[in-house]
């Protein structure tokens, strides 16, 4: 989602609160909870899951392995739920021609550097760069080359944009910032 006027362009980024992340976190949580319940019920000899008799799984080695996978899955699931609740990766890109400033803001993990805020002068921007990687896992990423700072990615690597969409976005941004486009 973006908002544009004559002098200001603001690009909002979603971050980790995507439907696919919610689905994966829920599937992983339910699956690992099932594994842990099967492992625990085989240890206790009780039937906690009605459609899986506890007598089918002896505790050593199946029950231990199922419990281990359940606990590991719960840790990974809790990590996913934390990244969703903290909304890691969300933020905005703000290009202001009137003041001559570019601001890039992202939310990170909790701690000292939770707020990632970068500020550059528009005159320090050398170019807008498109990096294309072809093959089985084709990828198109948009970068902004800053003098003395290197390249800063503006699109996420998992943002499956078509070549036409990435070219359109790069052309609009380069026109707005009045800088050239490079393709690598």
Curated annotation (Swiss-Prot):
Transmembrane segments: 19-39, 57-77
One Pfam short name: Ycf4
GO cellular component: chloroplast thylakoid membrane; photosystem I
Entry's Gene Ontology BP terms: photosynthesis
UniProt xrefs under InterPro entries: PSI_Ycf4_assembly
Functional summary from the UniProt entry: Seems to be required for the assembly of the photosystem I complex.
Family: Belongs to the Ycf4 family.
Name of the featured protein: Photosystem I assembly protein Ycf4
């Amino acid at each position: 989602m973006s908002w544009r006027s004559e002098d200001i362009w603001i690009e909002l980024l979603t971050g980790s609160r995507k439907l696919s992340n919610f689905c994966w976190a829920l599937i992983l949580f339910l699956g690992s909870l099932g594994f842990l319940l099967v492992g625990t019920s085989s240890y206790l000899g009780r039937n906690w899951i009605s459609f899986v008799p506890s007598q089918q799984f002896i505790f050593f080695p199946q029950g231990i392995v199922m419990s281990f996978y359940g606990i590991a899955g719960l840790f990974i699931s809790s990590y996913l739920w934390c990244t969703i609740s903290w909304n890691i990766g969300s933020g905005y890109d703000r290009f202001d021609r009137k003041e001559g400033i570019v601001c890039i803001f992202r939310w990170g993990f909790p701690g000292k550097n939770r707020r990632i805020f970068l500020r550059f002068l528009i005159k320090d921007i050398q170019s807008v760069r498109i990096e294309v990687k072809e093959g089985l896992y084709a990828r198109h990423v948009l970068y902004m080359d800053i003098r003395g700072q290197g390249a800063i990615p503006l699109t996420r690597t998992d943002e499956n944009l078509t070549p036409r969409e990435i070219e359109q976005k790069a052309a609009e941004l380069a026109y707005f910032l009045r800088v050239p486009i490079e393709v690598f």
